[in-house]
Amino acid sequence: MKKRALVSVSDKTGVVEFVKGLLEQGIEVISTGGTKKLLEKNGLQVIGISEVTGFPEIMDGRVKTLHPNIHGGLLAVRDNETHVAQMNELGMEPIDFVIVNLYPFKETIAKPDVTFADAIENIDIGGPTMIRSAAKNHKFVSVIVDPVDYDVVLAELKENGEVKEETKRKLAAKVFRHTAAYDALISNYLTEQMGEESPETLTVTFEKKQDLRYGENPHQKATFYKAPFAVTSSVAYAEQLHGKELSYNNINDADAALSIVKEFTEPAVVAVKHMNPCGVGVGTDIHEAYTRAYEADPVSIFGGIIAANREIDKATAEKLHEIFLEIIIAPSFSKEALEVLQSKKNLRLLTVNIEKATSASKKLTSVQGGLLVQEEDTLSLDESTISIPTKREPSEQEWKDLKLAWKVVKHVKSNAIVLAKDDMTIGVGAGQMNRVGSAKIAITQAGEKAQGSALASDAFFPMPDTVEEAAKAGITAIIQPGGSIRDEDSIKVADTYGIAMVFTGVRHFKH
């Protein structure tokens, strides 16, 4: 019996050449709507779907393939005598190939002016039903939803006269991934339209961007996936201008650096190691900002990741060129800066839009057996809600330093302490199991610079010991959430040493 293929695609990439190849193999082709017109326009002989169903396409194409003659031909088990007898009795013929991709729902809802009606109209019904039927019966039916697989199928047909069973299984698995992702997009769109924040089931879909050489360590396998809709201010959608491909750790560190630099509107540069900032500087221009970020910790910056929120110019590039760095991220690089930096063949240069995340952005964290979902921590300092419990208020310069330290401390692994002075961080204490331990690390790193600096803490002081350490180091201003049952003890110590302290009422834990 002559083999038959059903072709109905929204993405018409390569379909004319593929169908031509099928016809050359003696395969009869059935087609629908716009696909049929395209194939006939290119001189290919195809059969209209209505000739198979005996029923016209109706309701603006909503109903055309939802017919027993189609699904019987797809689902019939060819070595089941009952199925074969029923097909013969009803005049059905088997369909051996299905080439279908779905209505462009993703592209439709990505349009800024899309209406709800447009979105609904672009939910495919017949397509998913066909490819699921074909994939279920993949022992007998080859189903292709991705143009990248056309060449593989044609090559096997030419070589063997049929598609290998292993290939059919792979294609079937791709179908169910394809429909699952498609349904997830629809589910998420409708859920968002209804304003539901915590649905009873969560469906997420990501698209493979690249395989990685390995994960956090060489013995771990890893892959990088991107969100289906472009998040322009992200590493996933950054443009790489130069250098080796990104590693797993590169991606994590670059994401951390980008998150911090988004906090600043003035020219700023952030240096990151192991997802913690080692130096942050701001200035009147990007060169000055980088100089301060470098001076913040000239040891730890070696082998680090740099993020800037302004174009990298030649002067800044020449300074960056002096040390070993893994990645530089910026909105752009001047032509002269690129010439300087591209002389280092392994240095990765990325361009990305610098836009602060919104609270609508969700952070997903996997745990064993589950997934945590929360809003991104995008809350900025609100000066209208702060309180100053100490006798002395911060000076203008202290306020400037406090604000910088507060912007940075929320991005440091808890327990977190950050010291800032003169438009730069001078000490970062991260990830200690007690707060005073983090304070001691930050103070030790700052050394003599701690005198007259400002301290930020991501959470309240359970005891006054951190304030005591700050006083010993000559720190003159502190910003912290407040809210401890022993706040009064910390306030008394601050007043004793003339330290100005600000309560924000907001905690910024980061785990």
UniProtKB/Swiss-Prot annotation:
<keyword id="KW-0511">Multifunctional enzyme</keyword>
<dbReference type="GO" id="GO:0006189">
    <property type="term" value="P:'de novo' IMP biosynthetic process"/>
</dbReference>
<keyword id="KW-0378">Hydrolase</keyword>
<dbReference type="GO" id="GO:0005829">
    <property type="term" value="C:cytosol"/>
</dbReference>
<dbReference type="Pfam" id="PF01808">
    <property type="entry name" value="AICARFT_IMPCHas"/>
</dbReference>
<keyword id="KW-0808">Transferase</keyword>
<dbReference type="Pfam" id="PF02142">
    <property type="entry name" value="MGS"/>
</dbReference>
<comment type="pathway">
    <text>Purine metabolism; IMP biosynthesis via de novo pathway; IMP from 5-formamido-1-(5-phospho-D-ribosyl)imidazole-4-carboxamide: step 1/1.</text>
</comment>
<comment type="similarity">
    <text>Belongs to the PurH family.</text>
</comment>
<dbReference type="InterPro" id="IPR036914">
    <property type="entry name" value="MGS-like_dom_sf"/>
</dbReference>
<dbReference type="GO" id="GO:0004643">
    <property type="term" value="F:phosphoribosylaminoimidazolecarboxamide formyltransferase activity"/>
</dbReference>
<dbReference type="InterPro" id="IPR024051">
    <property type="entry name" value="AICAR_Tfase_dup_dom_sf"/>
</dbReference>
<feature type="domain" description="MGS-like">
    <location>
        <begin position="1"/>
        <end position="145"/>
    </location>
</feature>
<dbReference type="InterPro" id="IPR011607">
    <property type="entry name" value="MGS-like_dom"/>
</dbReference>
<keyword id="KW-0658">Purine biosynthesis</keyword>
<dbReference type="InterPro" id="IPR016193">
    <property type="entry name" value="Cytidine_deaminase-like"/>
</dbReference>
<dbReference type="InterPro" id="IPR002695">
    <property type="entry name" value="PurH-like"/>
</dbReference>
<comment type="pathway">
    <text>Purine metabolism; IMP biosynthesis via de novo pathway; 5-formamido-1-(5-phospho-D-ribosyl)imidazole-4-carboxamide from 5-amino-1-(5-phospho-D-ribosyl)imidazole-4-carboxamide (10-formyl THF route): step 1/1.</text>
</comment>
<protein>
    <recommendedName>
        <fullName>Bifunctional purine biosynthesis protein PurH</fullName>
        <ecNumber>2.1.2.3</ecNumber>
        <ecNumber>3.5.4.10</ecNumber>
    </recommendedName>
</protein>
<dbReference type="GO" id="GO:0003937">
    <property type="term" value="F:IMP cyclohydrolase activity"/>
</dbReference>
